[in-house]
């Protein structure tokens, strides 16, 4: 059985008991280097996931008789690896154990409700700045290519510099920082972040 577990934004201290139990019973464990390092005592086979998703799919396919757990950042189905694995193997063959997404964690820390929030991501994908500008409350996971500064620049160009950006940096880590800034004032680089954009009207 293939199981995909959400690790939350920073590691095992935010994982569910079900996720930790799945890892305890796994024959093989796959994930990014940072994720695998959270489980130094795991004695089974390991696969370090890089940019080549095809290599992961082949590795899993060759071990279908084993209990495989794939470690996913945040929540596996919020712009995560779980989506790709379900599409490839089918939901009948994949068990998803949810995790806390970076967006959920940031909203909890900042006291921002998610009831009317538009969710998206610029992590490894293109984002529509027109859609960002047209929604009153947006939350997204970002990356180095399209981070808070790049998003702010595009919003200012669309007349949205008055809006508020909440930037969660290194979430759930010892060096976590949460910044509240007008979009027009965002002009720095931030590490491993999620962003909420609010319309102050």
Swiss-Prot record:
MF (Gene Ontology): cobalt-precorrin-7 C15-methyltransferase activity; protein methyltransferase activity
Methyltransferase found in the keyword field: yes
Gene3D superfamilies linked to this entry: Cobalt-precorrin-4 Transmethylase, Domain 1, Methyltransferase, Cobalt-precorrin-4 Transmethylase, Domain 2
Known catalytic reactions: Co-precorrin-7 + S-adenosyl-L-methionine = Co-precorrin-8X + S-adenosyl-L-homocysteine + H(+)
Gene that this sequence comes from: cbiE
Name under which the protein is recorded: Cobalt-precorrin-7 C(5)-methyltransferase
Database matches in CDD domains: Precorrin-6Y-MT
Keywords, alphabetical: Cobalamin biosynthesis, Methyltransferase, S-adenosyl-L-methionine, Transferase
Recorded metabolic or biological pathway in which this protein acts: Cofactor biosynthesis; adenosylcobalamin biosynthesis; cob(II)yrinate a,c-diamide from sirohydrochlorin (anaerobic route): step 8/10
Enzyme Commission number(s): 2.1.1.289
Gene Ontology biological-process entries: cobalamin biosynthetic process; methylation
Keyword flag Methyltransferase: yes
Origin superkingdom: Bacteria
One Pfam family from the record: TP_methylase
Similarity field: Belongs to the precorrin methyltransferase family.
Originating species: Salmonella typhimurium (strain LT2 / SGSC1412 / ATCC 700720)
InterPro entries: 4pyrrol_Mease, 4pyrrol_Methylase_sf, 4pyrrole_Mease_sub1, 4pyrrole_Mease_sub2, CbiE, Cobalamin_biosynth_MTase
Phylogenetic lineage: Bacteria, Pseudomonadati, Pseudomonadota, Gammaproteobacteria, Enterobacterales
């Amino acid at each position: 059985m293939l199981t995909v577990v959400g690790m939350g934004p920073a590691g095992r201290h935010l994982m569910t008991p079900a996720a930790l139990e799945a890892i305890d019973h796994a024959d093989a464990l796959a994930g990014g280097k940072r994720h695998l390092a959270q489980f130094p005592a795991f004695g089974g086979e390991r696969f370090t996931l890089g940019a080549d998703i095809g290599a992961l799919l082949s590795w899993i396919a060759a071990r279908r008789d084993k209990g495989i757990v794939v470690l996913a950042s945040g929540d596996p189905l919020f712009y995560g690896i779980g989506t790709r694995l379900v599409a490839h193997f089918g939901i009948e063959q994949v068990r998803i154990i949810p995790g806390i997404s970076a967006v959920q964690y940031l909203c909890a820390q900042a006291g921002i409700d998610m009831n009317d929030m538009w969710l998206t991501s610029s992590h490894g994908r293109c984002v529509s700045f027109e859609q960002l500008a047209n929604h009153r409350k947006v939350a997204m996971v970002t990356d180095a290519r399209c981070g808070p500064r790049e998003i702010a620049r595009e919003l200012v160009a669309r007349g949205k510099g008055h809006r508020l950006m909440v930037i969660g940096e290194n979430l759930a880590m010892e060096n976590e920082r949460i910044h509240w800034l007008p979009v027009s004032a965002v002009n720095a680089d931030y590490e491993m972040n999620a962003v909420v954009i609010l319309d102050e009207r």
